[in-house]
Structures are given as C-alpha cells and as structure tokens.
Amino acid sequence: MTARRAPAVNRDVLEQMLVDGTAALDIALTDAQRNQLLDYVALLGKWNAVYNLTAIRDPKQMLIQHILDSLSIVPHLRDRASARVLDVGSGGGLPGIVLAIVQPDWQVTLNDIVQKKSAFQTQMRAELKLANLSVVTGRVELLQPGVEVPEKFDMIVSRAFADLSDFVKLARHLVAPGGSIWAMKGVHPDDEIARLPEGSRVKQTMRLAVPMLDAERHLIEVVVDEAN
C-alpha cells in the first residue's frame, strides 16, 4: 500500500508561521536555528511516510502541534544554563530535538524503546548537526547512570509518555540532586497528580499558551525525594 503523502506547503509560509509563533512566545531565534527547525519539519514529514512517526501529516499542523507546542515550554525552562536533559518516550524527537536546537548549551538525550524511532533521532542528530544531542534506546527504568547514560539529569521531560505517576516511578532514579521531572500534558491531570508515588510532589503547574492552537496545555514540574 502506498503511504499517504503530506500536502506540499511553501517553506516561506512555514517560516512566517514560525516567526509569528516564536514572537508570541517571546523566543528569539537565530537564522540558523529557524532553518534547523524548518528542516526538522521537512525531515519529519519525509521519514513519516515510511516510519509513521506521527499521525499529523500536514506541515502546517506539524509546525503548530509539534514545533510550537514543544517551544511553549522553553520560556519556563530557559533560565537553567548548561542543563542535562532527558526526553523520555521521545518518538519523533519531541520535544528533545526542538530543545537541543534552541538551547545549544544544554546536553539533550533522547530515549525511546523503539529502534526505528531511535534510528530517526540519530539521523536528525547528523542532518541537523546537533552536537549537543545524544540518543539511547531502551526502557527508561533500566537506564543506569554511568552505564547506558553518562550521569543523572537536571531535567527529565516527556511530551507523550505514560500516566504522570508512571512517568515519575519509572524515571525518578535518573533525577540529579536539585533536578525535576517535567511533564507536558493537555487538560490539567488532577487524577494523575492524585496518584503520584510516595516521595514525590508537584512543585508547580503552568498553563501553556501554544500559538495558533486552540487546545488546553499544561506543564507540570514534579520533584522527588533523593532518598526515594
């Protein structure tokens, strides 16, 4: 069966959407970063026809629902200089690749259990020339600092990985002292927060405004006790 092709969209149209979106988020991009993000959208569309990385096939919607959605967390995190970041269940590289592009001083690691998705992520590292990006394949709960990953992380993020309580249970051993777990959610996850495991708590909840997207979005910061 022939894969459905994404509709063609002029790059200038996408660039203007990106310019408008980042202005609304108060994010200043260099020309190089803007081109990297646009190249990423094009490559995501190209590989998606083969690997089905995302259900979204329209480039405009990819820009809004993937790129701008991922960028919406940057204003809340960018004061953390030289951070070590783990993106769990990264899939097509979201939000990790976007973070690596706009925060070149961060060291970003992408994690997924599906080898073909890791292969795509590795290809993006090469094609987008992201020296601050690394990829590790495997279950997050089995990753050990000093073995599969060099060390613990200042920020562990996820955009579409599991229930919040499960996310915390599986990833908490990788949080560095003073670090946090950051979960990107749609509607406010009251039920998931109520099920958080012992030794963890919500530090703050932020409502996100994604440009051009009429949908509810939240960012939840969870801290864990070091003894747990």
Swiss-Prot record:
S-adenosyl-L-methionine binds at G89, L94, V140, E141, R159. This is Ribosomal RNA small subunit methyltransferase G. The keyword Ribonucleoprotein does not apply. Gene3D superfamilies: Vaccinia Virus protein VP39. One of its GO terms (cellular component) is cytosol. It is an enzyme of class 2 (transferase). SUPFAM superfamilies: S-adenosyl-L-methionine-dependent methyltransferases. Keywords: Cytoplasm, Methyltransferase, rRNA processing, S-adenosyl-L-methionine, Transferase. Belongs to the methyltransferase superfamily. RNA methyltransferase RsmG family. It comes from Burkholderia ambifaria (strain MC40-6).
